[in-house]
Amino acid sequence: MNGAVCVLSALIAVFTCFSCRPAVQDERAVRIAVFVPGFRHDSPVYAMLCDGVERAVTQERATGRSIGLDIIEAGPNQALWREKLAHLAAEQRYRLIVSSNPALPHVLEPILRQFPLQRFLVLDAYAPQEHSLITFRYNQWEQAYLAGHLSALVSASAMRFANADKKIGLIAGQSYPVMTQTIIPAFLAGARAVDPAFEVDVRVVGNWYDAAKSADLARILFHEGVDVMMPICGGANQGVLAAARELGFYVSWFDDNGYARAPGYVVGSSVMEQERLAYEQTLRCIRGELPSAGAWTLGVKDGYVRFIEEDPLYLQTVPEPIRVRQSALLRRIQSGELTLPVR
């Protein structure tokens, strides 16, 4: 860690004389960097981020615009993120650096001060006080509440793998504020809206890639009576899916459409429209319409948090009475009849 700090300090010293003036750019030429704090294909969130930015760039290139795009996969070692972001900012080549992770506003704090003219867009994060930083967060209380509600409906049903225990599970990659303060309590609240007796058993992998460990944790939960589990552990999600097929339990998927990942086992997909948001905000950047700073929260009523209920695999796997109750909850949130916390 001390080495990373020294490297960052050296970078800042070298580029101090350049940090207060913008890079020279052709008015029509745009260059964008996507900073992936992990690996693109290990995480639905990062895959959607890259897909959305690429779609916007491809669309605008078709009109004759000169647009450069660099996608940098930084890996899961958070200790290196600040150093790598400082390198990008110091290059003074990018109109916008785009990323996605709740921890990034904190990581960016010294870089924003040193390079105030470099604009950053971070999705799935919230930082209302920072200059030159634009953040959008999804209302993950709504997202996790929907997932918990569906999980409890399935657990309390007569479906093949359901049991009599009032217990559902969540396997997280790591423990972090959004997980402990929003996702877990909202997941539990959604379940208890079905039956106040429900409990949530939470296990933590310790990283975002160890599928063998997540599978072991899923086996432990299964043998303790958990019949529906929600994995939020990046590439390690695959271990939970493998255990579900091996043992016979259900999976509630988070972030993107997961029904096809394990047909017959994935019973719900509570998603955030990350690809759409990345596409829209990248277009705004290219067209010169993106503000210099700001923080926004988007939820069900905005159309950026959804529960996917039209997928044929959902219709085939989940009985109609459960689908009707889940749909009724979704409509109550959409209409404003049910107001959930904004977090």
UniProtKB/Swiss-Prot annotation:
Pfam families named among the record's database cross-references: Bmp (PF02608)
Gene Ontology CC terms: plasma membrane
Lipid sites, type N-palmitoyl cysteine: 20
Keywords annotated in UniProt: Cell inner membrane, Cell membrane, Lipoprotein, Membrane, Palmitate, Signal, Transport
Similarity-based family: Belongs to the BMP lipoprotein family.
Subunit architecture: Monomer in solution. The complex is probably composed of two ATP-binding proteins (RfuB), two transmembrane proteins (RfuC and RfuD) and a solute-binding protein (RfuA).
Function: Probably part of the ABC transporter complex RfuABCD involved in riboflavin import. Binds riboflavin.
Protein name: ABC transporter riboflavin-binding protein RfuA
Organism this protein belongs to: Treponema pallidum (strain Nichols)
